[in-house]
Amino acid sequence: MLFQSTAARSDAPRRKHIPTALGGLRKEKAVGSDLNRYFSQMGAHVKVLEGKSPGRRWGISGSREEAPRIVLDIRRDQHGEYFEIRTGPGGRQEIVVLNVEPRERHLLLLSRQFGEREQFLAKQKFLCGHDERHWFVAAIPENEPVSTVAGAKIALKPEGVRTREGLLGISRKASFQRRNRAFIRQGEWFFVPAALEADPRLVLRNEPLSRGNGGKPHWAEECYRSGGDTVYVSARYPSGLTAEEYKKLPASERNSGFHIMKRDAAVYVRGKMSHPDHETVTLHGWHRVLMNTENRSSAMRFLAFLD
């Protein structure tokens, strides 16, 4: 599902603000070309498919009212990776590019949905960009009033990371790097140095870290968990079942590839952290694992993209 991007034009401005809406997809055919223009400024391709149901491939079910009216994904064709935006049937969509950072290869996208009677329904914001090796999409929490790429990046940082940056006096420039004195980042995971004495008997080796959405896990050379709830995880139940929920399953299903994990535990890792889409990082000493704030966003269910 992935593509070789073309380089952003060298004469492109460093920062672009696009304060006005690009228009409703149903009403203005120019929207598609405008999206192509803004995505191309960061070296990406985009395809917009209007009036298309998310379908089974996105793993989304429920009534028409419950179904997302927009779904974003990273797909791949013969030319490589591209962004795919699908808008559901019924009502009207507006897609607004709020900010483009060509040199950083990021943009902030706003989606607004209207009903068949033109009543406002909902809005979501998505950070689209390139991180290390591939394009990505991240949903921004709805309670974060961001209008720029920089603001979106800050909004995706967990509170513990923001607090530590403030205490250490991390500069704004350094705060956007993948590694500084406050943290090391790999994809959606932040690793914060921690003073910890772990019981060697409880240290796990070659342990997967997953946010439970079916994406590819990050692998920790050494992992230590403290607290949290014991859950039973399988391909069908990636977010895990409690012991009570697990016991209610038929015996045949309970024997179908479940393994026991901890949910909402304090997680610490040490050594090498690896992931096929990211550069391997080495953590010297124990680090607390914090996930970005994307899971606070209801718009996260509108993403088919899984890291």
What are these regions (language model features)?
Residues 166-274:
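Long, positively charged binding patches that form subdomain-scale interaction surfaces
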Residues 27, 55, 63, 84, ...:
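Intrinsically disordered, low-complexity, compositionally biased regions/tails
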Residues 262-277, 282-302:
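Tight coil/turn sites that cap or link beta-strands
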Residues 49, 75, 86, 110-111, ...:
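A structural detector for beta-sheet-dominated domains
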Residues 87-187, 192-195, 201-204:
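Extended, non-transmembrane interaction/recognition domains
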